[in-house]
Amino acid sequence: MAFSLSENPRLLNCLDSDIPALSTCSNADTFSRMNTMLGNSLDLSGVCTTPTAKCKRDPFNGRPDSDLSAVRSRMLFLSGGQDSSRGLPDVSNWGLGLQSLSLSDWERPWSSHDSDPSAQTNTASLHGILGTPSHLSNRLPSYSEPSIGATDFLERFPGMARLNSQSFLDSHSISPVDSETSGFSSGSDHLSDLLSSLRISPSVPFLMSSMQRDPLKLALGSRLDHSSSPLTPPPSATSSGGLSHRWPGASIWPNWDLMKTPESPFSIEREAWLHRQAASINEATFTWSGQLPPRHYQNPIYSCKVFLGGVPWDITEAGLINTFKCYGPLSVEWPGKDGKHPRCPPKGNMPKGYVYLVFESDKSVRALLQDCTEDLLHPEGYSEYYFKMSSRRMRCKDAQVIPWVISDSNYVSCPSQRLDPRNTVFVGALHGMLNAEALASIMNDLFGGVVYAGIDTDKHKYPIGSGRVTFNNQRSYLKAVSAAFVEIKTPKFTKKVQIDPYLEDAICQSCSREPGPFFCRDKTCFKYYCRSCWHRQHSMDILSNHRPLMRNQKKRDVN
């Protein structure tokens, strides 16, 4: 393919930033004792050794070293099926703090691992086996049985090769009770005291700081359940399943695995929604520069909806209607999220600086344009219209009026050519000045073979920012799909658009039984899938970085 999917380094390198990863200064002596008991086999270079004034007492004074060894064994030998690595860890997840020990598999503490299907059912039985008192059961983390062999374990944790862990691997126990470092029973109160004295989990600001740098994560954060801690994974994050390892690692997104729940029934939908926003964070693989084709209209028919930009900041809906009602009955649509336009701005929020005016007839739009100041842009032949309006605190402000000529929604270069949807691409993030003819000209210059271009519109026949282009050959189609992102530069604007295969209602091409709403655009797949077939196909590591496409569920008028 002509473009590459690269991993966002900001999240993976967050541990190398200037932000203190862990508050381990008060625990330096603890880690030093642990390292001594383990034969100096750990790398403590990432642990702060500066003494702090707040640490007044040593929780380990008076305790024999043998009483601490089993706890250290538990903290180091985490189960490969531990579910806490699924989503965002809880503040009380003490095991996460051991990433400062530079263990190889904890370089990416939130990477996804295959879970043990029996993880949930074994929790209660493990408490019984270990003899944990009931009053401690809600204070200690629960782990599933390790299901990996010694070879796999050492491959995943090469830093543990020197440790005497054979008894742990053979016994399938969390604590190696038969080892030389085991000095007390699993139910001892020393364990509770030791864990309560440690503060080795990263703080909330540290975990959230890297996410606050990314607008996608901020948008996603608003979807979290406000009744729970922002660092608490959703309930389904700890559920088990053989298809839990989905889309980790190589992704153009800033590690969506941090916040999503793989087993959620709508995880694929969230991936598809994120892909629709990909133009904002990806580099263009093709660039087109030039003048847009000139426009010539004779008795144009306008959409009854117009864009009004640069309105006074203190304008009200009543003021807008009072200003424009002389041209005919109208309604006002304020900008909203996800393409929804409420009838009035939300209470407590300032207007966005632009609105949409919806008249009942295109004759009202004609009359409005006649009262506007017209600036003709050469050589495109595109006219800009400005209307002088006032508010209580602003006088004679020029607001831009952007109409839409309905004939600009479609362009056909060869009327006799049969349009094949299999050679059609979807183009998103279009600029408002691009009509169908200009889009066809740009795509033909880049890829060739364009026979049709269309602009998607709403119920008022006003463009919604996307379009379609049909080619007369598969070579041009595949070249456009592989390009994925194209930057368009004109004297008036610069815009990066996104190109994807045009999707239709289709049957799953894997099982041929269920509807296939999910499409994989990677060239190794390039087919429609139902939900179960998508999970089955992309549970393989080699295909796990593929991203789904879905048809936009918003209603639109496809001309």
From Swiss-Prot:
Sequence-specific RNA-binding protein that regulates mRNA cytoplasmic polyadenylation and translation initiation during oocyte maturation and early development. Binds to the cytoplasmic polyadenylation element (CPE), an uridine-rich sequence element (consensus sequence 5'-UUUUUAU-3') within the mRNA 3'-UTR. Belongs to the RRM CPEB family. It holds the Pfam family CEBP1_N. Zn(2+) 1 binds at C508, C511, C530, C533. The keyword Metal-binding applies. Residues 304-401, 423-504 form the RRM domain. One of its GO terms (molecular function) is translation factor activity, RNA binding. InterPro entries: CEBP1_N, CEBP_ZZ, CEBP_ZZ_sf, CPEB, CPEB1_RRM1, Nucleotide-bd_a/b_plait_sf, RBD_domain_sf, RRM_dom. It comes from Carassius auratus. The lineage of its organism: Eukaryota, Metazoa, Chordata, Craniata, Vertebrata. Its main location: cytoplasm. GO terms for cellular component: cytoplasm; neuron projection; nucleus; synapse. Zn(2+) 2 binds at C520, C525, H538, H546. Interacts with kinesin, dynein, APLP1, APLP2, TENT2/GLD2 and APP. Both phosphorylated and non phosphorylated forms interact with APLP1. Interacts with TENT4B; the interaction is required for TENT4B-mediated translational control. It is found in: Cytoplasm. This is Cytoplasmic polyadenylation element-binding protein 1. Residues 223-244 are annotated as: Disordered. GO terms for biological process: cellular response to amino acid stimulus; cellular response to hypoxia; cellular response to insulin stimulus; mRNA processing; negative regulation of cytoplasmic translation; regulation of mRNA 3'-end processing. Keywords: Cytoplasm, Metal-binding, mRNA processing, Repeat, RNA-binding, Translation regulation, Zinc.
